[in-house]
């Protein structure tokens, strides 16, 4: 079918008639000029891809009529220009593709039809752990261990890059996916097949939104959805409301981009932006560098929006030149965006589009702050940190409470480390990590940390040796400018050696703490602290022994490491006392903004980016030496504990079955609010007494070889055993934190996997009860695949985080939502009832279904299949089954 909008096509430059674009101004529709810039990107993609099948003319009209339709809950298709994956989510995607090829072959189709149509980049950044720190060879040793642990996964990924077209792999050691995307992969404008069009993407990592800081529309999706996009399917999304976030004023000289983003995170959580786009505008935006904008856009999942968009302006264009992009390409990028009405001047208010709602922040009101101790939205001013931590100590167990009895607030424990005596107390810092895509891509905060380290060393300060310090930059570029500017030796002297290029501590790959430290924490029952420049600090994520974790800017991470405790008021108390007996305060060593900018201007230069990135795909010799099979179908190794053919498609036929009601289901878990995907499917270490550990031990592995759950995502047997295996899981059946539940027929307390297995052996269906924001956090597809394998047919919750709900749909698990004002408490549900959920043969989006209990009580819930496309996936038993049937016909 030809495109009904073909008449909009014209050359961008008459001198190059072969280079065309869809000129949206030729629509001659006054509504276009008042659309938010983010919605203009959706509109262009719909017009360019309009085939009257996947994308219909009516979809284009709905997007153009955004001002009215944003309130109508209507779905629109979106075909992004590309996909990015990281290795933890990328391995299961390639496993699924390999298994889908097998399934298509088995059903009589051509397996090579399973191939990415949409270009995909897979960046390996999640595997490296902080095993070695505080030594010059930490990086080399951690990278060697990474290869030793992950050889089989890496070989499999290398096979995938050869077996599938359109899939590029960025080897380990290159940097963090979002920074590599910002500095290297992002096109801003595509120039492909004779057409210019806006760069846009979805990624299998929730912090994909970082790229919105450069004016590239992108957000995180579940791995399952990303696979469908790679196979040419559009994403089906509800046309979002767009909140205009107006920035005015100039930030105070002592304030960092981290302080601004933590302030915005708290503010937008209060405004309520889940499922919406946020678009930044106003004169304050022009004051922010691309690194600052990217930091703000990065934490979009923490404030709950789908995307946090900064349209392209002159600052974006300068950044492209600064990062070594081709000057001719940059010229065409600006020319195209101006021609199509997508280039922004933030000082010109006549360009301000319509928004659903406008909120404002005056940057001069931002103060230095941290967030914690358990959630990124719980912002605390640095001046209040001591007082806030001490009130959390005694407060009842919760997001801001540890329930330590008042007479134990000053407990402490002495221990011996490296033949010296030290003391730990509540609030002692045991992990200090400069880590994560949020901050390590920002030269101003990284150089700020380096200059602070230099001044601290010059003033005679040091960091206690038992504190686990680490620096994991987002790319080789960071190391380059830290080294060239001369601050690296000072960072090393304080223990902040480069330990690897990857997510590391931010995703729980913090590695072990010294045994003496763990012993002191456990014996003293102490609330020990991790301070990190990360973006998430949910319980049990950073390290099992740090009950309090605070997000802070890189300079503050160093400051708290030097202080050794969170219980310090920097204004009144010294950071430390030097050998001369002089007290040194934080204000004495805090670098000024002018100092930082002078160093940044001198050392962050285009040549550096070119040098790092021109050899990115070949620089890792260990990767180059890996052997990988060349077959188009993967030859599964039955002995492998990393890569296993999943059971998802074993019984798949070409015929569709009508939907079945769920009869007499038991509740596997009865959960509360804010259950994260970390609770459902942890990414960190495999506990020695867990079902997954027993599985690995039975196959002859020692605990040293267990690796992490994240690295085992290519093996469904381990991931099923790791489902709900987080030690911080709070199940109302037990009233304590444990990865366990009650097997209701027998009354026994079992590990969640063992209980689920028992129910499945008896042929009994399962559901999960939950509260608000079920599935918040990382875009973890195993948080939907795992429950599916445990036999969970439905989840009944008060509300869902966007990505997780669509992942459940993608696996054929029914997301049910209580009616407004109702929940387990108001309905008097204990979770010990048996549930029958009536599912009619004819389904409609967001329809209500009847739930009947064995007590005789009945109530209704909303079936959260939000679009017709989602219902199609459900009828097929999930999105991948749908794709296999489609590719086989």
From Swiss-Prot:
Keywords: 4Fe-4S, Cytoplasm, Iron, Iron-sulfur, Lyase, Metal-binding, RNA-binding, Tricarboxylic acid cycle. Its main location: cytoplasm. InterPro entries: AcnA_IRP_Swivel, Acnase/IPM_dHydase_lsu_aba_1/3, Acoase/IPM_deHydtase_lsu_aba, Aconitase/3IPM_dehydase_swvl, Aconitase/IRP2, Aconitase_4Fe-4S_BS, Aconitase_4Fe-4S_dom, AconitaseA/IPMdHydase_ssu_swvl. It is found in: Cytoplasm, Cytosol. Substrate binds at residues 86, 205-207, 536, 541, 699, 779-780. It is an enzyme of class 4 (lyase). One of its GO terms (molecular function) is 3 iron, 4 sulfur cluster binding. Its cofactor is [4Fe-4S] cluster. Its EC number is 4.2.1.3. [4Fe-4S] cluster binds at residues 437, 503, 506. Binds 1 [4Fe-4S] cluster per subunit. GO terms for cellular component: cytoplasm; cytosol; mitochondrion. It holds the Pfam family Aconitase. It comes from the Eukaryota. The keyword Membrane does not apply. One of its GO terms (biological process) is citrate metabolic process. It catalyses: citrate = D-threo-isocitrate. Interacts (when associated with the 4Fe-4S) with FBXL5. Interacts with frataxin(81-210). Bifunctional iron sensor that switches between 2 activities depending on iron availability. Iron deprivation, promotes its mRNA binding activity through which it regulates the expression of genes involved in iron uptake, sequestration and utilization. Binds to iron-responsive elements (IRES) in the untranslated region of target mRNAs preventing for instance the translation of ferritin and aminolevulinic acid synthase and stabilizing the transferrin receptor mRNA. Conversely, when cellular iron levels are high, binds a 4Fe-4S cluster which precludes RNA binding activity and promotes the aconitase activity, the isomerization of citrate to isocitrate via cis-aconitate. Belongs to the aconitase/IPM isomerase family. PANTHER family: ACONITASE/IRON-RESPONSIVE ELEMENT FAMILY MEMBER. This is Cytoplasmic aconitate hydratase. It comes from Bos taurus (Bovine). The lineage of its organism: Eukaryota, Metazoa, Chordata, Craniata, Vertebrata.
């Amino acid at each position: 079918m030809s495109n009904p909008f073909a008449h909009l096509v014209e050359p961008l430059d008459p001198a190059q008639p072969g280079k065309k674009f869809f000129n949206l101004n030729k629509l001659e529709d006054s509504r276009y000029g008042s659309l938010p810039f983010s919605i203009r990107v959706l509109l262009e993609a719909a017009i360019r891809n309009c085939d009257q099948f996947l994308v219909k003319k009516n979809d284009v009209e709905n997007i153009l009529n955004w001002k009215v339709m944003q309130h109508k809950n209507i779905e629109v298709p979106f075909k992004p220009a590309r996909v990015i994956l990281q290795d933890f989510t990328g391995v299961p995607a390639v496993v699924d593709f390999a298994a889908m090829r097998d399934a298509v072959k088995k059903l009589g189709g051509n397996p090579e039809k399973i191939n990415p149509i949409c270009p995909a980049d897979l960046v390996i950044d999640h595997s490296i752990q902080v095993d070695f720190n505080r030594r010059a060879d930490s990086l080399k040793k951690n990278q060697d261990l990474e290869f030793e642990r992950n050889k089989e996964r890496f070989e499999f990924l290398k096979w995938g890059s050869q077996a599938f077209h359109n899939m590029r792999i960025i080897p380990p050691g290159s940097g963090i996916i979002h920074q590599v995307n910002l500095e290297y992969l992002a096109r801003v404008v595509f120039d492909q097949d004779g057409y210019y069009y806006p760069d846009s993407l979805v990624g299998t990592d929730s912090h994909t939104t970082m790229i919105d800081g450069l004016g590239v529309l992108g957000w995180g999706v579940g791995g399952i959805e990303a696979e469908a996009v790679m196979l040419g399917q559009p994403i089906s999304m509800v046309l979002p409301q767009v909140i205009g976030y107006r920035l005015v004023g100039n930030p105070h000289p002592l304030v960092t981009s981290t302080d601004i983003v933590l302030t915005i995170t708290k503010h937008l959580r209060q405004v309520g932006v889940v499922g919406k786009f946020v678009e930044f505008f106003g004169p304050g935006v022009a004051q922010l560098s691309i690194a600052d904008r990217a930091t703000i856009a990065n934490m979009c999942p923490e404030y709950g929006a789908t995307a946090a968009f900064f349209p392209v302006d002159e600052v974006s264009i300068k950044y492209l030149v600064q990062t070594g992009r081709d000057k001719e390409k940059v010229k065409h990028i600006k020319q195209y965006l101006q021609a199509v009405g997508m280039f922004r001047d933030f000082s010109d208010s006549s360009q301000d589009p319509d928004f659903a709602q406008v909120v404002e922040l005056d940057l001069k009101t931002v103060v230095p702050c941290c967030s914690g101790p358990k959630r990124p939205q719980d912002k605390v001013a640095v001046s209040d940190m001591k007082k806030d931590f001490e009130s959390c100590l005694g407060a009842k167990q919760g997001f801001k409470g540890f329930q330590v009895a008042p007479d134990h607030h000053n407990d402490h424990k002495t221990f011996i480390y490296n033949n010296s005596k030290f003391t730990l107390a509540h609030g002692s810092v045991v992990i200090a990590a400069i880590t994560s895509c949020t901050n390590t891509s920002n030269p101003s905060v990284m150089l700020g940390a380096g200059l602070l380290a230099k001044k601290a060393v010059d003033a005679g300060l040091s960091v206690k040796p038992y504190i686990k310090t680490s620096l994991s930059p987002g790319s080789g570029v960071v190391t380059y400018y830290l080294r060239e500017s001369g601050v690296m030796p000072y960072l090393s002297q304080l223990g902040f050696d480069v330990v690897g290029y990857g997510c590391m501590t931010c995703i729980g790959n913090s590695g072990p703490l010294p045994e003496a430290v763990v012993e002191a924490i456990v014996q003293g029952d102490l609330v020990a602290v991790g301070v990190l420049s990360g973006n998430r600090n949910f319980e049990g994520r950073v390290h099992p022994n740090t009950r309090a974790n605070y997000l802070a800017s890189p300079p503050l991470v160093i400051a708290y490491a030097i202080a050794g405790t969170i219980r310090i008021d920097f204004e009144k108390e010294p950071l430390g006392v030097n050998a001369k007996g002089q007290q040194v305060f934080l204000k004495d060593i805090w670098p000024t903004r002018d100092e930082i900018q002078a160093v940044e201007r001198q050392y962050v230069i285009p040549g550096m980016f070119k040098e790092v990135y021109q050899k990115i795909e070949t620089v890792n010799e260990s990767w180059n030496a890996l052997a990988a099979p060349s077959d188009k179908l993967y030859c599964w190794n039955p002995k492998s504990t990393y890569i296993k053919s999943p059971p998802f498609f074993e019984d798949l036929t070409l015929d569709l079955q009508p939907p079945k009601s769920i009869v007499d289901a038991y509740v596997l878990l009865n959960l509360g609010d804010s259950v994260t995907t970390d609770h459902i499917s942890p990414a960190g270490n495999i506990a020695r007494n867990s079902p997954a550990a027993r599985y690995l031990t039975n196959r002859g592995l020692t605990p040293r070889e267990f690796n992490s759950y994240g690295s085992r995502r290519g093996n469904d047997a381990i991931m099923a055993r790791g489902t709900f295996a987080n030690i911080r899981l709070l199940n109302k059946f037990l009233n304590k934190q444990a990865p366990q539940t009650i097997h209701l027929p027998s009354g026994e307390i079992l590990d969640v996997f063992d209980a689920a297995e028992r129910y499945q052996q008896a042929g009994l269906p399962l559901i999960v009860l939950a509260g608000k924001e079920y599935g918040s956090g990382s875009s973890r597809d195993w948080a939907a695949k795992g429950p599916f394998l445990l036999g969970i047919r439905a989840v009944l919750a008060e509300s869902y985080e966007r990505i997780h709900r669509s992942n459940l749909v993608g696996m054929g698990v029914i997301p049910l939502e209580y009616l407004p004002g109702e929940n387990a408490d108001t309905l008097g549900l204990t979770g010990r009832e048996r549930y029958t959920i009536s599912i009619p043969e004819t389904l409609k989006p967001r329809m209500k279904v009847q739930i009947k209990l064995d007590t005789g009580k009945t109530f209704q819930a909303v079936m959260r299949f939000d679009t017709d496309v989602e219902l199609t996936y459900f009828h097929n038993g999930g999105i991948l089954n749908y794709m296999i049937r489609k590719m086989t016909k």
